[in-house]
Amino acid sequence: MKLLLDTHVLLWSLLEPGRLTTGVATALEDPANELWLSPVTTWEVLVLAEKGRITLEPDPFHWIRTVYTTIPFKLAPLNHEVAVESRLIDLPHQDPIDRFLAATARVYGLTLVTADERLLHSQAFSALPNR
């Protein structure tokens, strides 16, 4: 399975693994599955750190670089196709990060791993719920 981690699932998997369901934790640990990330997740992690909502040591930039060089994530590029799909996809809200992640899942044929109930109500893409 190709799993696209949303921001909270990424952070929980590394900082608070107890917040993951058994099913999600098992899926993330399964070597048969591919773990994918979007650049918008990197951006959102850095924004959360800048706002003081999370603490990443020694600093957010070093932390994120270390994560991406030690864990074999695949990059789901933010390209024109994803940008267009983010406006076409049927979601109940306009949050741009959620729209980019949902569109990325559709464009690349990925399963979005999320706890976001607003996203989990959509049938527009494949999702693995963390609830």
Spans of model-derived segments:
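Active-site neighborhoods of divalent-metal-dependent phosphate/nucleic-acid chemistry enzymes
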Residues: 55-57, 61, 69-117
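Phosphate/NTP-binding elements of NTP-utilizing enzymes
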Residues: 45
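Phosphate-binding/catalytic loops
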Residues: 87, 123, 127
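Short, well-structured N-terminal submotif of metal-dependent ribonuclease cores
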Residues: 1-37, 51-66, 70, 108, ...
